[in-house]
From Swiss-Prot:
Domain of life: Bacteria
Lineage of producing organism: Bacteria, Bacillati, Bacillota, Clostridia, Peptostreptococcales
Disulfide bonds, paired cysteine numbers: none
Task of the protein: Negative regulator of class I heat shock genes (grpE-dnaK-dnaJ and groELS operons). Prevents heat-shock induction of these operons.
Naturally occurring in which organism (per UniProt): Clostridioides difficile (strain 630)
GO molecular function: DNA binding
Keywords: Repressor, Stress response, Transcription, Transcription regulation
The protein's name: Heat-inducible transcription repressor HrcA
Amino acid sequence: MELNERKLNILKAIVKDYIETAEAIGSRTISKRHDLGVSAATIRNEMADLEELGYLIQPHTSAGRVPSEKGYKLYVNSLMSKSELDDNDKILIEQCMNHNINHIKELIHETSKLLSQLTNYTTVAVTKSLINQSVIKHIQLVAMNDNNILLIVVTDKGDLKKANLTTNVYLDQSKLNLISDNLTRKLLGKSITDLDDNLIAFIKYEISEYSGLIDELLNALNSNMKEEDFSLSLNGATNIFSYPEFNDVLKAKSFLNMLEKKETIADIIKSKGIQKDNLNIIIGSDNDCELAQDCSIVTATYNVDRDLVGRISFIGPTRMDYARIYSIINYMSLLINRK
């Protein structure tokens, strides 16, 4: 039994209608709502074939059919087309992105918050630590008082990091300026993660007169200046309750328990799913996490100069409006490419 064009059109219609209504779809409904050029009886026969092929499921309480995970996957892979965003959505997205366009981490987190409101799904923003990916542009030491020095590091990404240092030797600002210039020359273009033992030994040798201060400075660079591997923000955690699939209290509780586990969420959205443009789509049981197997997770990845800087993920029922999310992400990519 083959998947001919008629079966594909019927499957597409069922998926779209079920996403919209959350109700099992019958042949008469398809016949009335979609101009497929065939009778309700023919549609009914084709639906029976689609069920036999594993693309549809018949719930016990209904004569209609709903898409299976296999049906959703075929829809996402081959049948889905972008939906048209309304002008209001476009304006809100553009305003949010314009406000944060010079700060990629803030852009990702703030846009994720807006997208949760626009889609009524849970969204997760994950950004990698940019300070660890950046390279050093300038180092400045500033005298605060007799024993305290402020370390300021500026990176090529425009990030500014500070740390307080303590020294047993008084150093006036002119000496600190000389040390700052020397350190900047030695570390210019180096990533903080590049500070291996050989480089540290070389710096201490070159500025041996102030070895005590250099020890503390390098320790600050290696610890205080480094950030967590990623930061994660979650929006719309309770949006899931608006979907009938999660009316079951235990299912809803399991979902909320999953959202409380930051590392679990970060791992889930990195899992491999269906690839469509810059989207990764994980449907139902393809989720490695058992608590997420009633959900679909759609993730968009963002890069700066080919380096991964963050992801925005949408979490919702498998009856997710994939086409709308696809359109939103494509519109965001269009705006980013214009900048």
